[in-house]
Amino acid sequence: MNWQTFENVWDALEDDPVKRENYKIRSELMITLAEHIENTYKNQTEAAKALGVTQPRISALKRGAFNEFRLDMLVDMALRAGLRVTVNVKAD
């Protein structure tokens, strides 16, 4: 059997490089938001109110329901949470 190693799970799962990079960025935002929510708010209801979403959206985020979140939605939530979002664009 031939084993391959990948730097990121999306490198293994997605062949399309455009989708793969989008997935990586969304994953990073979701992880950061979930950690921030866990460390900042008393409960999901409080987090939802602060982030301008419903409690079920917070639950979906914490469950890692990846396909339920667009990149712009995650950026909006991060900014409402007081997080700083930066973009680093570079040519390959």
Model-derived segments and spans:
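DNA major-groove recognition helix of helix-turn-helix/homeodomain DNA-binding modules
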Residues: L71-V87
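Recognition helix of helix-turn-helix/homeodomain-like DNA-binding domains
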Residues: L51-N67
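Short glycine/serine/threonine/alanine-rich loop segments
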Residues: K42, V53, L83
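Helix-turn-helix DNA-binding elements, focusing on the entry/boundary residues of the two helices
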Residues: N43-Q44, Q55, L74
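Short, charged recognition helix plus adjacent turn
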Residues: V89-D92
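N-terminal flexible/basic segments that precede or flank functional cores
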Residues: M1-T32
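Residues at secondary-structure transition points
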Residues: R20-K24, E28, K42, E68, ...
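Short basic helix-loop element that most often maps to the first helix and adjoining turn
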Residues: I31-A50
